[in-house]
């Protein structure tokens, strides 16, 4: 088959849109992929400054929660090598994905997409993922996360990905209230983002 992309304007004769170096504020009603420069430019730049792993992970999660794909450009040198900054960035992304890829691969957007510091994704099997974006320098976490207007079955469980930690939750009028354990806060603050799986 043939896939057609117009880099400038969405239209009836193309398959998906490619916002360049930006992320739409809300989900788009057609397939899309944000094309983001990791550092320097589209081609190799000497002494390029690369985005942090945290910035790249937050960008990825935000895009996926809005139903898009991320194309992250990492340009090689004339010798076909990457800078140390590029390797560091990709290693940080890889380490995070090794724990939390379940919240990214094979997921779809789900309203409200994002609330506070939390992005929402879901899978066809009913799994819902809340990814809390930890900001640089953040020193504390909320004691609870309120998933607005969400009313799960009483039998569902909430669990932190990468751990066996089950989280207590209650149902209130404004949504599902998930408790964050105090004894996990130091570990969670040391990550770029952590994921709560609801199923």
Residue ranges of predicted features:
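Mature catalytic domains of secreted/periplasmic carbohydrate-active enzymes
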Residues: 1-199
